[in-house]
Design a protein with these regions (language model features):
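Active-site-adjacent structural elements in enzyme catalytic cores
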Residues: 1-202
């Protein structure tokens, strides 16, 4: 396990590090560094048409990389972020094609773990897909992750902080809200905070 200073140096040099979120471990790298992103795709054996999310540290960051945001976006942010929620918005021209595979949308994540948030604030935006080989279960245990990647990666260990449930993915890019992946935040949780939101059944 490396110190935060060393993890910052690895990220700054275009490397990838394993970091805890409130859900599962992620494999993080600098999002605006194409070679760093390519390195994560290769480590995970991830198909190139499978887009990455942007891990950011503020509401302003979300606005910086999206467009045509719904008027209730700030309410969702205030109610659930940072936390186990990924939101999908229309991407603006600041989002590199190597992040979202040239799609019209991009996902945003604000993990609720102090070390990871600090590193995102310092070196972000970062990509941070789950720390596992594609097709394998999401990474819950630091030592198992390092073993799975043949000890090619290092990071910050905090197994006890993880829920072990992936984040809910909420698509806000259309006229109605869609839950693309059910995680710990449910439709009922969202409606309790924002009762006027209209959901589309997937």
């Amino acid at each position: 396990m490396k110190s935060k200073k060393m993890l910052r140096e690895i990220l700054a040099d275009g490397g990838a590090v394993v970091l805890p979120t409130e859900t599962v471990y992620g494999l993080f790298a600098k999002a605006l560094d194409e070679s760093a992103v390519n390195h994560v795709y290769e480590l995970k054996n991830r198909p190139r048409d499978k887009a990455m999310n942007l891990n950011v540290s503020s509401y302003e960051d979300i606005l910086s990389y999206s467009k045509e945001q719904p008027d209730y976006l700030k309410k969702i942010y205030d109610a659930f972020l940072p936390g186990p929620l990924t939101i999908i918005l229309k991407a603006n021209d600041q989002v590199p094609k190597w992040i979202n595979s040239g799609l019209a949308t991009v996902g945003f994540r604000l993990p609720d773990h102090p070390v990871t948030r600090e590193l995102i604030q310092a070196e972000g935006p970062l990509i941070g897909p789950s720390a596992n080989k594609s097709g394998k279960a999401s990474g819950r245990y630091f030592d198992q992750i390092r073993d799975q990647f043949d000890f090619q990666v290092t990071g910050y260990q905090d197994d006890d902080a993880l829920l072990g449930v992936d984040s809910t993915i909420l698509d806000l890019s259309g006229n109605k809200v869609k839950i693309l992946r059910q995680g710990s935040i449910t439709q009922e949780d969202i409606l309790a905070k924002l009762p006027k939101i209209s959901f589309e059944e997937v």
